[in-house]
């Protein structure tokens, strides 16, 4: 055991950047449709580790960096898959950033049958509600959504990836 680490502090460094990504895929099976959506979003060839919805304090919003293949990437994401031809599925993420930069931000993810505008509106409202429940003031809310109209098996995907500068 490392005696230099306090038991009340994590030995892991919190990520200091976040990136919003979204994509869609349509192919012959659900897993490949999901993988195609990751390719479209630019976050393929890494291992997504699903996290709950907290943005570390003072994290910077940046375009998705060049993450080494095979990396373990903390990610809050939503996705929706369907095999109903002609159906539209969507996924969206939002991030509420606090006015007080010592506080954490909130990441929300949502997916649904229907278009991306409604899904993005819903996920933005979820972020607003999360801040209201905490009694915090919002500086801004950012969001991103995708949609896929199914031809074979379709998938819509949206995510917030946390990484390091």
UniProtKB/Swiss-Prot annotation:
> Which residues get modified to Pyruvic acid (Ser)?
53
Q: Copy out the cofactor comment.
A: Binds 1 pyruvoyl group covalently per subunit.
Q: Give the stretches traversing the membrane.
A: none
Q: What is its EC number?
A: 4.1.1.19
Q: Which HAMAP family match?
A: PvlArgDC (MF_01404)
Query: Catalytic activity, per the record?
Result: L-arginine + H(+) = agmatine + CO2
Query: InterPro entries this protein is in?
Result: Pyr-dep_his/arg-deCO2ase, Pyr-dep_his/arg-deCO2ase_sand, Pyruvoyl-dep_arg_deCO2ase
In the record, biological process GO terms are: arginine catabolic process
The record's similarity note reads: Belongs to the PdaD family.
Taxonomic lineage of the native organism: Archaea, Methanobacteriati, Methanobacteriota, Methanomada group, Methanococci
A GO term, aspect molecular function: arginine decarboxylase activity
Q: Which domain of life is it from?
A: Archaea
Residues the UniProt record annotates as site (Cleavage (non-hydrolytic)): 52-53
Q: Which metal ions or organic cofactors does this protein require, according to UniProt?
A: pyruvate
Q: Report keywords, A-Z.
A: Decarboxylase, Lyase, Pyruvate
Q: What is this protein called?
A: Pyruvoyl-dependent arginine decarboxylase
**What organism is listed for this UniProt entry?**
Methanococcus aeolicus (strain ATCC BAA-1280 / DSM 17508 / OCM 812 / Nankai-3)
């Amino acid at each position: 055991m490392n005696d230099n680490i306090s038991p009340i502090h994590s030995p892991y460094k919190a990520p200091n950047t976040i990136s919003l990504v979204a994509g869609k895929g349509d192919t012959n099976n659900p897993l490949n449709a999901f993988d195609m959506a990751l390719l479209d979003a630019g976050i393929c060839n890494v291992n997504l580790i699903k996290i709950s919805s907290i943005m570390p304090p003072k994290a910077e919003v940046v375009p998705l960096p060049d993450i080494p293949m095979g990396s373990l990437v903390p990610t809050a994401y939503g996705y929706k898959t369907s095999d109903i031809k002609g159906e539209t599925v969507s996924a969206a993420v939002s991030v509420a950033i606090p006015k007080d930069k010592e506080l954490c931000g909130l990441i929300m993810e949502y997916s649904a049958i229907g278009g991306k505008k409604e899904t993005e509106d819903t996920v933005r409202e979820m972020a607003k509600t999360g801040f209201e429940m905490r009694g915090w003031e919002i500086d801004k809310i950012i969001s991103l959504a995708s949609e896929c109209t199914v031809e074979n098996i379709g998938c819509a995907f949206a995510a917030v990836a946390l990484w390091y500068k």
